Amino acid sequence: MSKKCQLTGKVANNGYAVSHSHKRTKKLQNVNLQYKKVWSTEQNKWIKMLISTKAIKTLTKAL
């Protein structure tokens, strides 16, 4: 399973976890990916896609 949004192409973000004493350790911020069935008008059927929650929110706003 790829950790990439099939609709927007979003991938994980590299960052730092900063402690109280300001020690920095590398941290990976993953994308919130969910499986969602999306209706395809071209193929005239449901397609199961792995998309980010932001993409789901955008799709529901468009409808």
Curated annotation (Swiss-Prot):
Q: Does the keyword Chloroplast apply?
A: yes
By its UniProt entry, which InterPro entries does this protein fall under? Ribosomal_bL28 (IPR026569), Ribosomal_bL28/bL31-like_sf (IPR034704), Ribosomal_bL28_bact-type (IPR001383), Ribosomal_bL28_sf (IPR037147)
Give the UniProt record's GO annotations in the biological process aspect: translation
GO terms for CC? Answer: chloroplast; ribonucleoprotein complex; ribosome
So which domain of life are we looking at? Eukaryota
Q: Where is this protein chiefly located?
A: plastid
Q: Provide the protein name.
A: Large ribosomal subunit protein bL28c
Which organism does this record belong to? Answer: Porphyra purpurea
